[in-house]
Amino acid sequence: MMNIAFKQAHSGNYRRAARGKEDIRYLVLHFTANDGDTAKNNADYFARAEISTSAHYFVDENEVWQSVHDADIAWHCGTRGTYFHPYCRNANSIGIELCSRKNGEKFYFMPETVRRAQALTRELMAKYGIPLEKCCAPLRCYAQKLSCAVRRERIRVDSIQAGVTEKGGT
């Protein structure tokens, strides 16, 4: 089991709930679209003030921080009723943010960030019985005016999925 630090997000950034194992059906992999941020920086940021957005986990090359309990609903995959996946919703998913780096206009991840995200993804898939095909990457970032690098730079969840299946995932 991974060592995961916890710092509760501000109450205005998520919705308290009592989701059970059967309620969580998707993992949504995002990235922060920052240059050199850390998991702890993100946990601190989401704890400070109400910004009406959040994720459950933040992953960098050194550690993983959780800011919303799995049973609660983080606001990470759609804004005010606008969703980009036919079935995945905030209420039935867990959001994982990978801390990114930037070289010119291209975002990338440190290799250890990818390894930690793979391990976290495997752990959550096993815990909630989530199949690999229900691990999603979004088509947009938090800032609507930015073209999400997951799509623009063709950074996808392939490397994370490969690591999941290599280590005995589903």
Which residue ranges define each predicted feature?
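Hydrophobic/aromatic pocket-lining and membrane-interface residues
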Residues: 57, 96, 117
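Basic/polar, cationic surfaces and motifs that engage anionic cell-wall
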Residues: 1-8, 16, 21, 99-170
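N-terminal catalytic cores of peptidoglycan-degrading enzymes
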Residues: 1-89
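Short coil-to-beta-strand
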Residues: 87-98
